[in-house]
Amino acid sequence: MKYVSTRGGEDEVSFTSVLLNGLAKDGGLYVPKTFPKFSTKDLKKLSHMNYAELCYQVTKGFISESDIPHKDYKKICYKTYDKNFGENIINIDKLSENENILNLFHGPTLAFKDFALQLLGNIYDYVLKKKRIELTILGATSGDTGSAAIYGCSRSKKIKTFILFPHGKVSETQRKQMTTFKNKNVFCIAIKGDFDDCQKLVKDFFNYEEKKINLAAVNSINWVRIMGQLVYYFWSYFKVEKNLRSVSYVVPTGNFGNVYAGYISKKMGLPINKLVVSSNKNDILTRFFETGVMKLKQTIKTVSPSMDIQVSSNFERLLYDYSKSTKLIKNLYRELG
């Protein structure tokens, strides 16, 4: 499997390069050249698997044997979804005959991002040991990414983790999860501004040509984050639908990573009908889908800080998938500023 940048300024790269860089050199986001496809027969087989095995089967197609031998990757999947997630990795509350709530808070930090970041941390640890290198991780958070990234990556002695968060704009619980974590390789930095300011600083660091350290991303700008989120779409689908009929998902959306994972799941063959983008007052995506216009506004502080975002990074991946035009993507994001 090879990956390309949404902005076209870089040759095809390997999974390992995507993992260790996060952001493409031209400022774009990495996407796979192709996507694994599952037939109806494949889906029936997948529906009987436990979560760790399902993770392995759904995501192994994104990883070449030359990057991580699949027998080793399978061990990583089983190591990830162990006692850290409790006996019920995911549970679903039934509201009515056709309505369910997917609960994704059974990870170690009670955030849905644990599902991808625990996997990402273990993949990092494997690759860093294999290559005998160390890594500095840089992330921006509005709350849940920070604590989940810290917990997911802190067990590796080869990783230093720096998390930027907007001062006074994350929940008190998540602030404490980040700032009271006892590990000499973890650094949390409060920034005067909002999440978009933090995310811009992260992207600026990655675009700084003179950087002398191995720098990687844990935000959903890193493709591996998206890859890890595919699995619970498959898992939840198989729990609520036994006859392979289509199902719709309503997804609270900030940086567009979660709902984009649903979109990719559909591309891979999962029978998803609609993906409904749910927002708060920071409704740039809602406005875009209603009007076709993407215009930045001042970020409004709400009780759902993970959605207090104006620049939804992963939306770039969706635009690229629809257009396949790197020139268009570059021009659009230059205009967006």
Map each language-model feature to its residues.
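PLP-dependent amino-acid enzyme catalytic core
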Residues: M1-G337
